[in-house]
Regions:
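Short linear sequence motifs
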Residues: 1-2, 12, 87, 111-113
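Short, Lys/Arg-enriched charge-dense amphipathic segments
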Residues: 16, 54-69, 105-111, 121-125
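Generic, low-specificity signal for short hydrophobic/alpha-helical stretches with a mild N-terminal bias
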Residues: 1-4, 8, 25, 34, ...
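Charge-rich, low-complexity N-terminal segments
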Residues: 1-24, 29-36, 40-41
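Well-ordered alpha/beta subsegment
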Residues: 89-125
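Residue-level marker of positions within ordered structural domains that often coincide
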Residues: 31, 75, 122
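Amphipathic alpha-helical interface surfaces
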Residues: 18, 22, 48, 110-113
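Short, conserved beta-strand/beta-arch hydrophobic-aromatic motifs that form part
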Residues: 36-95
Length: 125
């Protein structure tokens, strides 16, 4: 983990622990580069396929005290109550925001979606 990633989570130890667990699962897919920005951490293979942030994608009263938002880029929309928000950012590219409150949410369904996003990011245009 880079110093920039650690700095992103400064003062947020619960979110850092969740990010570490998430990143471990994602890196099992293959080569991943994490690039920390001011408002998000982009996860890339050939292209950005996912981002991690603490954006408020739901009203504050509906969000847990500690959470991460995992944003996935996919070719098709997902239909699940776990998706907090989704939009077709451009034709054939759907952006999905998923609120994660704990490592127990890193389940088979989520890992399948991450795998789809990883493959989508790694495709040839």
């Amino acid at each position: 983990m880079t110093m920039d990633e650690l700095f992103f989570f400064d003062g947020k130890p619960e979110e850092l622990a969740l990010y570490e667990a998430l990143l471990e699962q994602i890196k099992a897919l293959g080569a991943v580069t994490a690039v920390a920005h001011k408002t998000q951490i982009s996860l890339k293979n050939r292209r950005v396929f996912a981002c991690v942030s603490v954006f408020r994608v739901l009203p504050k009263r509906l969000l847990p005290a500690h959470y991460l938002v995992l944003t996935l880029g996919l070719p098709d929309p997902l239909d699940s109550p776990r998706i907090a928000a989704k939009t077709e950012a451009q034709p054939g590219r759907w952006t999905h925001h998923i609120v994660l409150a704990g490592a127990s949410e890193l389940d088979a369904e989520l890992l399948e979606w991450i795998g789809l996003a990883y493959a989508f990011g790694n495709r040839n245009k």
